Each structure stands twice: as structure tokens, then as C-alpha cells.
Regions:
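Active-site-proximal, structured, solvent-exposed surfaces of multi-pass membrane proteins
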Residues: 13, 50-288
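Aromatic/acidic, Gly/Pro-rich catalytic loop(s) in extracytoplasmic/lumenal soluble domains
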Residues: 1-35
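A short, charged
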Residues: 34-59
Length: 288
């Protein structure tokens, strides 16, 4: 059977936590996915607010890497050509200490190799005319029976085993997804390699492939600040959620419930507007 690991988060945010500054949603939407997760620990994302705008500190870093291909895998012109099932390629790099590592791919596509493309030029030259003609015959009709529908890439490393699922527009569950982010985990001493295992033969093309390190040294302090003035005595009963909170200055209280127009909020008995915060949650303005 499979082996699973369960991890306890030491930095879980409370159910209701507060920000003293905000990030305009228009600005947030233009950030990269790595920048967004950093931003959410520093300011609340709102369409507009009377709070001061957050001065962001971003410290992610893209690191250069080298691709080392194994047997049955070849790198050529921004593509990885795989002629053997479960062929591997290693990404070798110098990761940052005390960082999370992310493998980010954009514009990923997959195409099945034809029978001729599966044979190396060296092997082809040693084949008889009869054998070559058999391959040509298979080559003329292979597209009618083997469409490029789906492929899987396993991403592995120390304490890491994840799979990227690629679906093409020929697959009945195709969703248009061609960009992927794989969290390769935290490394105290700087991770230095990731291994890609290609379950399927074929051509794996991509517009961009990068390794990004995200130092986490500031996370403890940022999470602590968000939870310093948080919602207390939280109760849920009779379709109602209540709690108590005091703030030292004007803040936005974010409640970890999906945003919905069906809710009504009251602060100190007065009806208060509910704002959509951090793209998915609800927020209330709190005055000092």
C-alpha cells in the first residue's frame, strides 16, 4: 500500500483574524502565484478600503537549473522527448536555505510519438527494408487509433511524491489547464534536485519551466501579527455566528467563511457591510 505523511501546522490562522492595511484587488490579480501567497500574509485583498495600502516585501527568487536526462529522454528546443515509459530527467539547482521550493510550468502540452519517432536514427539504420516498411505502414495509420489524450509526470525528491496530470483537448475531461505549480516542500539546508518521471512516451512541450525558492523566515512573525487581535468566543448556532473582538486601531476582520451575499453582519449592534476579501472570504471593517 501507499505511505502517507500527516503534518501539523504550527502557524494556523484563527477563524477570524485582522489586517491593518489592504492590497487593491486589481494590483493583486497582476501578481504571480508565488507573489500572491506572500501578499496574503501582509495585507487583505479588497476592491477598495479606507485602510492604508500595504507596502509589500517580496523575497521569492527564481534559481537557475540544469536538466540532466536519463535513458529514453532527450531535451530539444524547449521539449522533452520521451521514448521509454518511466524515463527520467533531473533538475539540478542550488536552492536557498530555509525555503519552500516550487516547480512552475507554463504552456505545457503533450503529444504521442509516432512509431517512427520511437526509433532512434542509429537503430533505424540497422533495420532491414522489410522492418522499415512495417514501421512506415504503422506510421501511416497510428493517428487513427492512438490520440494524444493524457499523460502523467511524477515529481519526486526527499519526502516528495507528486503527480502532474496533463490532459489535452482530445480528452473528454479536458479543462484547458496548461499551467502547473508543484510545491516541492520545505528544505532547511537548501534542496538541490528534483526528479521528473514520465509515465508515458511522447513529446512534452512547455513555454516556460522554472524553479522558485520562497524563504519562509518571515512567516512566523507575519502569522503572529494577523492573529494578535482575533475573533474570540466564536459560537455557531441557529444559522448565526457570533464572536468578540477588540482592536487597537482600524482594521479589517477576515472571517474564514466563503463569501456570500446571503449573510448579514452586525458590529456592536449596527448593520455593517460585508466585503469580499482575499478573493474567497468575508471581511468586516472594525473601528478603534
Amino acid at each position: 500500500g501507499k505511505t502517507y505523511r500527516a503534518y501539523e501546522c504550527d502557524n494556523a490562522l484563527p477563524f477570524g483574524y485582522t489586517y491593518d492595511s489592504y492590497i487593491p484587488r486589481e494590483k493583486y490579480e497582476k501578481m504571480s502565484v508565488i507573489e500572491k501567497q506572500q501578499a496574503l500574509l501582509q495585507g487583505v485583498v479588497l476592491d477598495e478600503s479606507s485602510l492604508p495600502e500595504t507596502v509589500l516585501t517580496l523575497n521569492d527568487r527564481e534559481v537557475p537549473f540544469k536538466i540532466i536526462t536519463g535513458k529514453g529522454c532527450q531535451e530539444k528546443d524547449g521539449k522533452l522527448i520521451v521514448t521509454k515509459e518511466n524515463a527520467q530527467a533531473r533538475l539540478v539547482f542550488d536552492g536557498l536555505d530555509e525555503s519552500e521550493i516550487y516547480l512552475i510550468t507554463e504552456g505545457v502540452n503533450y503529444e504521442v510519438l509516432s512509431p517512427r519517432a520511437m526509433i532512434s536514427d542509429k537503430k533505424w539504420k540497422n533495420m532491414s527494408i522489410y522492418e522499415q516498411n512495417q514501421v512506415f505502414h504503422e506510421n501511416s495509420r497510428w493517428r487513427y487509433w492512438k490520440e494524444s489524450q493524457k499523460a502523467y509526470i511524477d515529481v519526486t525528491g526527499k519526502f516528495l511524491n507528486k503527480t502532474i496530470s496533463i490532459y489535452t483537448d482530445k480528452y473528454n475531461a479536458y479543462s484547458g489547464k496548461h499551467n502547473f505549480l508543484c510545491n516541492a516542500g520545505y528544505s532547511r539546508m537548501g534542496k538541490n534536485s528534483l526528479t521528473l518521471t514520465f509515465q508515458n512516451t511522447g513529446v512534452y512541450s512547455y513555454d516556460d519551466l522554472k524553479v522558485v525558492c520562497q524563504p519562509v523566515t518571515k512567516v512566523d512573525k507575519q502569522v503572529k501579527k494577523l492573529g494578535e487581535e482575533s475573533l474570540q468566543d466564536v459560537k455557531v448556532e441557529d444559522h448565526e455566528l457570533t464572536g468578540k473582538i477588540s482592536v487597537s486601531k482600524p482594521k479589517a476582520l477576515v472571517i474564514a467563511l466563503p463569501y456570500s451575499t446571503g449573510f448579514t453582519a452586525y458590529v456592536d449592534g449596527k448593520k455593517t457591510d460585508i466585503k469580499q476579501a482575499n478573493t474567497m472570504y468575508m471581511a468586516l471593517n472594525l473601528a478603534h
